[in-house]
């Protein structure tokens, strides 16, 4: 699977309009696009939102680059600055709850972005130290991670903020260990908030992995 994550900073006072644009324009325009697996958008702050598109492959995403650029041009009315865009093939992840196509399921998303010194060591840390915490957690829906050059982007979606916070305490303990913190060049940035719009175009089954 191929992921594209878009993180704009919004002009003050435009957040509600931007969210409506995503729900009423972006989602309908891309629904039914060949190779598109899911669209997810969440609110991450007073003037920030985040959107993630999941594709079968980089090729299927690239085939829609013109439509993507047209959409970004239309959305520019809401942007205070050019958005950050991260993309890459999945290197980690798992489905923890089966979710049916077009199922409406509330979610709370946590996405962490950081520049890593050693990609292999960072991926091993996800598998060896983070995944066991995921496996023991309650309310977890799905996890994933990509690399965009030397930047690691990892995420998890939960049933509720409470479920996420419970697991986040354990995840932060792992991150605070010196050896784990040394994996990053600087402190990672976390974007956290409720999912306000989502569309799933295939069935996801518990235990499946995007890798």
Predicted features, each with a name:
Residues 1-50, 56-211:
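Short S/T/G/P-rich N-terminal loop/turn motif that feeds into the first structured element of a domain
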